[in-house]
Amino acid sequence: MKTPEAPPLAPDCLPSDQAPAPARLSRQASPMDKNTDPELMPTPRDGDDPPQVSSDPMVGLALSQELEEGVPASLPTPLESGFGSPSELSSRVEEKELSENVSLPAEETNRPELGPGEDVEGVSEELTPEDEGYTIWNYNFSQVPRFLSGSWSEFITQPENFLKGCKWAPDGSCILTNSADNILRIYNLPPELYNEGEQLEYAEMAPVLRMVEGDTIYDYCWYSLMSSAQPDTSYVASSSRENPIHIWDAFTGELRASFRSYNHLDELTAAHSLCFSPDGSQLFCGFNRTVRVFSTSRPGRDCEVRTTFAKRQGQSGIISCIAFSPTQPLYACGSYGRSLGLYTWEDGSPLALLGGHQGGITHLCFHPDGNCFFSGARKDAELLCWDLRQLGHPLWSLSREVTTNQRIYFDLDPTGQFLVSGSTSGAVSVWDTGGAGLESKPEPVLSFQPQKDCTNGVSLHPSLPLLATASGQRVFPEPTESGDEREEEVDLPLLSMRHVHLECQLQLWWCGGGPDTSISDAHQEEMGQGRTEGGGGEFT
């Protein structure tokens, strides 16, 4: 099937008539970067014993006391600005455009100029969002989200293709997806959302950029300070098997830089997890019992090696996910060894080692207040909430269905009130973290079924009440029932996929309330997806 022609990327979130001309990217895998530097990097110490995770409820007291006494007032000093450092606004955002987007009240425009020394009385220095003409949107999960648009034709061109998560850009201008065909795709925010009034019909979304990796993509992430108004901050990092870490330009899709890691045999090793520091100065990468820290101002092989397991103590296994606290100078690491570790940002000193999951950790997320963080694991039906002030045991747990080794994402809204998670069964569940109270197992406030296939990715928009979901999973043929031995048909397949529901698609849902909260039959038939129960979803 021919891929629809991609519309231009609107970097500054302006209507399409003000967006710059698009840039094309050929669908070719980027060659592996060559390295000529003979210098070897330090290697982690050997050790195969599991981490010494104490069951004592006093585990983590050291960190708790440190946080109670107070933390350093300043974060690590950002390094010299490089390819990903913010700079002045792009010249493409003209002064005229900026002035058109801000309207002053009539009182301000008609007010005469004040002479020197005249007192200003009754003038409010701060304008409210209503005065500036902005609309404040909040997430509302009192009713089932309304389906807006999605992309499905893009992923059916290859057999057995499926999505592997989705992530909104920090500025909300576009969304990034990963799929089993080793292609990263960027979609613009649907142009219908820029129109005033309620838009009931949305066209199918088409990617504006495709970035092809050479092998299975392990992890991907946006630059933490990404803003479409500043093109030099619009970057995406990705890591794939037997390849260096690639930095892609989110405007053109071109490869802009590479970070390479080598083992003790000077062999290239791939990172299993990626995370930019909050100030954008560093890129943290997870390896086997090691975290390597690259400076974003110096692409190449130079990095700081932070070993997480030494002398048969510490956090063993592959570091599968990394997350930074938004308020404290520390970060959390999850490993496939079923352990969680907390480390200082400055030098990686260990603060606490936690255990409690039944499977390898696949995703971490900090609450915006910085006091709590959430963890999820593969083949584990629990999402655990941890309080940094009392790390002896989880604060509470949330139940979700995860029966495979696939990474099932979850996300928090910008206020931290709602937590949304996918599941192997396809159901999307929403919990109110503010109303959890002292309950050990809070129940979801809403649960709905976007499709029958696995919902592996969820991402909440940073400023609009938009929920993005990604679906699909790797499926294996099931044995067929044997028929009569006297049947003459001998070419019947021994394995069949007739009972498998393949629904690989990206979907956008409006979570701000509205008159119509059901998925239309026309969209259901066009996408080939299963209908939800109860007119668009099922309340819990």
From Swiss-Prot:
Single Gene Ontology MF annotation: RNA binding
Matches recorded under Pfam families: WD40
Key words, A-Z: Chaperone, Chromosome, DNA damage, DNA repair, Nucleus, Phosphoprotein, Repeat, RNA-binding, Telomere, WD repeat
Transmembrane regions: none
PANTHER family hit by this protein: TELOMERASE CAJAL BODY PROTEIN 1 (PTHR13211:SF0)
Subunit structure: Component of the telomerase holoenzyme complex composed of one molecule of TERT, one molecule of WRAP53/TCAB1, two molecules of H/ACA ribonucleoprotein complex subunits DKC1, NOP10, NHP2 and GAR1, and a telomerase RNA template component (TERC). The telomerase holoenzyme complex is associated with TEP1, SMG6/EST1A and POT1. Interacts with the chaperonin-containing T-complex (TRiC) complex; which mediates the folding of WRAP53/TCAB1. Interacts with COIL. Interacts with SMN1. Interacts with RNF8. Interacts with histone H2AX.
Protein's name according to its UniProt entry: Telomerase Cajal body protein 1
Lineage, highest ranks first: Eukaryota, Metazoa, Chordata, Craniata, Vertebrata
